[in-house]
Amino acid sequence: MQNLTGPTPFPTDFSAQEANGLPSFSDGDIIRRPQLLEYANSWPAEVDEASLLPWLDSYFKRLSPIVPVLSHIAVYEAMLLGRHRSDRDLGAMILSMCSIVMIQAVYTEEAAHLDERTKTAKLWMQHSARMRSTWDFGQDPTIETILTSFFLFGCLFSNGQQRAAWHQLRLAVDMSCQIGLDQPDVYLLKTKQEREQRIRIYLSLAVTERYGFHIQN
């Protein structure tokens, strides 16, 4: 019998025959994998930042007054500095922000274009999910990671995909607990602006989670 070294939640006893039957990777495969990972997490080449700006404007005009969890100045500044291209959490959040405003914040006179908007939003959601699909996703969540799941929840819920939506909401809630949004002592170490943002996020998640529990039961 062969035993795996290190902690694992899975059975660790394998016979030699089972071990020999496992797939192997050549040196070339191992060398290429980091490059593939870097590509997978990069900003999508087919998404032009200029096409996102009107939707970011719409987000801050239509949704931000309802869920005031982001500073429009901070988001625009980050985009102008190109941070969304090097910070996959920020890039994924921006794409999810634009997606939710395309699907949810629809005025009556815009309803005729909803199908086209939904198609584009789904593409951006796919890019958003791809940007943060790393092997260690969830190990070190950020505010951007939490909000991405929160926005994806809204997109999926509006699209009638409730099970996937609740999964994203649970992710957002779990990650918010990981960084201590439910622990008052953590707020003492933050600036006034950070405290206010985190409190708004925590309240938004708590209210949404309670609403979700109510309609599911």
Predicted ranges, named:
Residues M1-L4, T120, N217:
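Short intrinsically disordered, low-complexity coil segments enriched in acidic
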Residues H72-L90, T145-I146, F153, L169, ...:
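Intrinsically disordered, low-complexity acidic/Ser/Thr-rich segments used as protein-protein interaction/activation
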